Amino acid sequence: MRLIPLNQAEQVGAWSAQHIVNRINEFNPTADRPFVLGLPTGGTPLNTYKKLIELYKADKVSFKNVVTFNMDEYIGLDTNHPESYRTFMFENFFNHVDIQEENINLLNGNTDNHEEECQRYEDKIKSYGRINLFMGGVGNDGHIAFNEPASSLASRTRIKTLTEDTRIANSRFFDGDIAQVPKYALTIGVGTLLDSAEIMILITGHNKALALQAAVEGSVNHMWTVSALQIHPKSVIVCDEASQQELKVKTVKYFKELEAENIKHV
């Protein structure tokens, strides 16, 4: 596992965006051989999306031959609801770059058969071989996507019941009213994520410090699903100083020395 210890959340956005651009450009995607990118929602990746849009407008990258898969979606929210993850992605990223709409893949939380929808999503991912790079965030309790504590580390795309802690955290997007936050969601599984060629997780803020500690210094544990990154052959965590507060000083020093060349220009 790589750890990229930065100072500010804005630097996390800049580093992660440049990493995505580098991977896309190195891959040199075509219509017949697209780059497959996994994407999250939430507050943490907003800086990354802003920087990606800047890099696109500066002609540093094209998303024309990029296929995307999102991590999750609430069940029961209208497609055009302001807090649906579909709305989030179009408003904060898709509408601002040259991605083709037919290359955008989003879970549908309003189908009559959720299990069928989850299998369709898994099959669609497999039709591309695998996801080349999956970017994600992490919850205060260490969950990735909506794989809440005690989720199977071999899990696939499925329905999940959201914990009260997650719903309280997400209520900030629903005028602070937890009653408006859906109780269920469709989410990729931990196993689905681990099938990706590369995983990049963004962690920012004091409230994520315990999750970062569990991911880096703890054991692989289904109570902290982010810890599954330890068994992935190519994973990277990009974090700000606030989220590093629970890490040992020598851990941060070790990774700063390892990644000195990769972070000096951020």
UniProtKB/Swiss-Prot annotation:
<comment type="similarity">
    <text>Belongs to the glucosamine/galactosamine-6-phosphate isomerase family. NagB subfamily.</text>
</comment>
<feature type="active site" description="Proton acceptor; for enolization step">
    <location>
        <position position="72"/>
    </location>
</feature>
<feature type="active site" description="For ring-opening step">
    <location>
        <position position="141"/>
    </location>
</feature>
<dbReference type="Pfam" id="PF01182">
    <property type="entry name" value="Glucosamine_iso"/>
</dbReference>
<comment type="subunit">
    <text>Homohexamer.</text>
</comment>
<feature type="site" description="Part of the allosteric site">
    <location>
        <position position="161"/>
    </location>
</feature>
<dbReference type="InterPro" id="IPR006148">
    <property type="entry name" value="Glc/Gal-6P_isomerase"/>
</dbReference>
<comment type="pathway">
    <text>Amino-sugar metabolism; N-acetylneuraminate degradation; D-fructose 6-phosphate from N-acetylneuraminate: step 5/5.</text>
</comment>
<feature type="site" description="Part of the allosteric site">
    <location>
        <position position="158"/>
    </location>
</feature>
<dbReference type="GO" id="GO:0004342">
    <property type="term" value="F:glucosamine-6-phosphate deaminase activity"/>
</dbReference>
<dbReference type="GO" id="GO:0006043">
    <property type="term" value="P:glucosamine catabolic process"/>
</dbReference>
<comment type="function">
    <text>Catalyzes the reversible isomerization-deamination of glucosamine 6-phosphate (GlcN6P) to form fructose 6-phosphate (Fru6P) and ammonium ion.</text>
</comment>
<dbReference type="GO" id="GO:0042802">
    <property type="term" value="F:identical protein binding"/>
</dbReference>
<feature type="site" description="Part of the allosteric site">
    <location>
        <position position="151"/>
    </location>
</feature>
<keyword id="KW-0021">Allosteric enzyme</keyword>
<dbReference type="InterPro" id="IPR037171">
    <property type="entry name" value="NagB/RpiA_transferase-like"/>
</dbReference>
<dbReference type="GO" id="GO:0005737">
    <property type="term" value="C:cytoplasm"/>
</dbReference>
<dbReference type="InterPro" id="IPR018321">
    <property type="entry name" value="Glucosamine6P_isomerase_CS"/>
</dbReference>
<keyword id="KW-0378">Hydrolase</keyword>
<dbReference type="GO" id="GO:0005975">
    <property type="term" value="P:carbohydrate metabolic process"/>
</dbReference>
<feature type="active site" description="For ring-opening step">
    <location>
        <position position="148"/>
    </location>
</feature>
<feature type="site" description="Part of the allosteric site">
    <location>
        <position position="254"/>
    </location>
</feature>
<dbReference type="GO" id="GO:0006046">
    <property type="term" value="P:N-acetylglucosamine catabolic process"/>
</dbReference>
<feature type="site" description="Part of the allosteric site">
    <location>
        <position position="160"/>
    </location>
</feature>
<keyword id="KW-0119">Carbohydrate metabolism</keyword>
<dbReference type="GO" id="GO:0019262">
    <property type="term" value="P:N-acetylneuraminate catabolic process"/>
</dbReference>
<protein>
    <recommendedName>
        <fullName>Glucosamine-6-phosphate deaminase</fullName>
        <ecNumber>3.5.99.6</ecNumber>
    </recommendedName>
</protein>
<dbReference type="InterPro" id="IPR004547">
    <property type="entry name" value="Glucosamine6P_isomerase"/>
</dbReference>
<feature type="active site" description="Proton acceptor; for ring-opening step">
    <location>
        <position position="143"/>
    </location>
</feature>
